[in-house]
Amino acid sequence: MTKQEKAENQEKPTEETVEETPKKETPFEPVMEADEVEETTEAQAPVEEADDKLAELQKKYDAMEDSFLRSQAEIKNIQMRNQKEQANLLKYDGQSLAKDVLPVLDNLERALAAEATDESAESLKKGVQMTYDHMKHALEDHGVKEIEAQGQAFDPTIHQAVQTVAVDGDQKADTVVQVFQKGYYLKDRVLRPAMVVVAQ
């Protein structure tokens, strides 16, 4: 072969087919450069900051809601307490007046206990009786009632023992044997305890 033919042979590819081995496809993995990593970190920082702020705001909201609910409950309790106090004020309205009138009633009872010696004293006693009855009915109309004491078992919540005596005859111990001063209720409240003598 001449030099020329050799050169042509080298330039022509051989007709033998060479099978190329297929390459396995690998999944695409982006390769980040240093600048891109910094940008991603910088982008995540505001998101994390926003999440922190959101969590903080949620805590504040929860605390404010709790405070609001507690305040509402407290207001409701105050309203109920005020209603109860107003109801008691209306129920026991006139308590101080009734207390002030009781000594007058006591004096009228003492006047009625005195003996009338002549006609003028008897007519005066009738006038005192009418005044006493009228005053007692007026007090009863406003819820003032006499405390039953004579012969009753001693009760320290409604009786005030001023003296004790020995049990005599058929008397029972801890029984009221004498009333020095009548006691009164105003509705269901003790206005004045009865002053009594108790057998022991």
Curated annotation (Swiss-Prot):
Disulfide bonds listed in the record: none
Keyword Chaperone: yes
Record field: compositional bias (Acidic residues): 32-41
Origin organism lineage: Bacteria, Bacillati, Bacillota, Bacilli, Lactobacillales
Family: Belongs to the GrpE family.
UniProt superkingdom: Bacteria
Name the record gives this protein: Protein GrpE
GO CC terms, sorted: cytoplasm
Record organism: Latilactobacillus sakei subsp. sakei (strain 23K)
InterPro entries registered for this protein in UniProt: GrpE, GrpE_coiled_coil, GrpE_head
Entries under NCBIfam families matching the protein: PRK14140.1 (NF010738), PRK14162.1 (NF010759)
